[in-house]
Curated annotation (Swiss-Prot):
Pfam families: Indigoidine_A. One of its GO terms (cellular component) is cytoplasm. PANTHER family: CARBOHYDRATE KINASE PFKB DOMAIN-CONTAINING PROTEIN (PTHR42909:SF1), ZGC:136858 (PTHR42909). Homotrimer. InterPro entries: Indigdn_synthA-like (IPR022830), PsuG (IPR007342). It comes from Streptomyces griseus subsp. griseus (strain JCM 4626 / CBS 651.72 / NBRC 13350 / KCC S-0626 / ISP 5235). It comes from the Bacteria. This is Pseudouridine-5'-phosphate glycosidase. The active site is at E43, K177. Its EC number is 4.2.1.70. Keywords: Glycosidase, Hydrolase, Lyase, Manganese, Metal-binding. Mn(2+) binds at D156. Its cofactor is Mn(2+).
Length: 323
């Protein structure tokens, strides 16, 4: 009987030592960091698991191109052959985009994946951890994980939140997906001491939507202002943690709010009718949102990611110039 691809055993390592598990930086990323050039980390889960093939590869290349156009160096993060890689070449990017056996890796999965010689695409928690460890100060993603609906019954919360509370990196995102419990997520970030600033907005974005309706305490209006916040945090010292820059998708690119609210209400009703609960809720809601909006939610997702990547690169450039 054929094996599950995720169960395949890799060839044993030759004399594996501590260095065998050190993240491997591409020559371009290493040179940029050593000379103080701006670098932006990018996650790979959106490439391997978030988009249909072959569009995922073209989007991956597009996002790296947006970083370069803004004057920074892209560092897409992934695990290949049991080695964390920060900065991928063209062949490696194609491998992540084209191999269905590439696993989804959060921070907790990194050590087992490295030891097993596995291939994996990194989520927000894994990417933020590896990027910060390499000395990269800015990371762009679509949206953060957060507190899930029905938290009181199942205590389902993304690992992103705790990891960001102890990882020194600036994360540019479009908030959290509106299928999550947005007020509870913001409360959790406050409890964990993670600052959130709205970029050009007084409200926390709703990922597919420009606004979730929830206010933010601080607003910045330029990459230079964000760079100044980064400098102030570094000068203050104290506990290490992330800075969240919440960048709303442009109103012209957001999912139609009326359509969003109607589809989400229908999907929540379907959840209750089918008895779906716990960890099954979020994947079900995401699938329903994609299907019932006929792909419009995916386009809003991509618009948000593009905006975040461009802004992250501009912030990285401003932070490098301020040093």
């Amino acid at each position: 009987m054929p094996q599950n691809p995720s169960d395949r055993r890799p060839a044993p390592r030759d004399n594996p030592g501590t260095n065998a598990y050190e993240p491997l930086l591409s020559a371009e990323v290493r040179a940029a960091l050593s000379t103080g050039l701006p670098v932006v980390a990018l996650e790979s889960t959106i490439i391997a698991h978030g988009l249909p093939r072959p569009r995922n590869l073209s989007v991956a290349r597009e996002l790296e191109g947006l970083v370069r156009s803004a004057g920074a160096v892209p560092a897409t993060v992934a695990v290949l052959d049991g080695r964390a890689r920060i900065g991928l070449d063209g062949d490696q990017l194609e491998r992540v985009a084209g191999d269905p056996a590439v696993r989804k890796l959060g921070h907790r999965d990194l050590a087992p994946a490295l030891a097993a010689g596995a291939d994996g695409a990194t989520t927000v928690s894994a990417t933020a951890f590896l990027a910060a460890r390499a000395g990269i100060g800015v990371f762009a993603t679509g949206g953060l994980g957060g507190v899930h609906r029905e938290w009181a019954e199942n205590q389902d919360e993304s690992a992103d939140l705790r990891l960001l509370a102890r990882t020194g990196i600036t994360v540019v995102c479009a908030g959290v997906k509106s299928i999550l419990d947005v007020p509870a997520t913001l409360q959790r970030l406050e409890t964990l001491g993670v600052p959130v600033v709205g970029y050009g907005t007084g409200h926390f974005p709703g990922f597919y939507l420009s606004s979730s309706g929830e206010p933010v305490d601080w607003t910045v209006h330029s990459p230079e202002e964000v760079a100044e916040v980064i400098r102030a945090r570094e000068a203050l010292g104290g506990p290490v943690g992330a800075l969240i820059v919440a960048n709303p998708v442009a109103e012209r690119d957001q999912l139609d709010p009326v359509l969003h609210d109607r589809v989400l209400a229908q999907a929540l009703d379907a959840c209750r009718e089918r008895g779906i609960s716990g960890q099954g809720v979020t994947p079900f809601l995401l699938d329903q949102l994609t299907r019932r909006t006929e792909g419009a939610s995916l386009e809003a997702n991509l618009a948000a990611v593009r905006g975040n990547v461009t802004l992250a690169a501009r912030i990285a450039v401003a932070a490098a110039d301020a040093r």
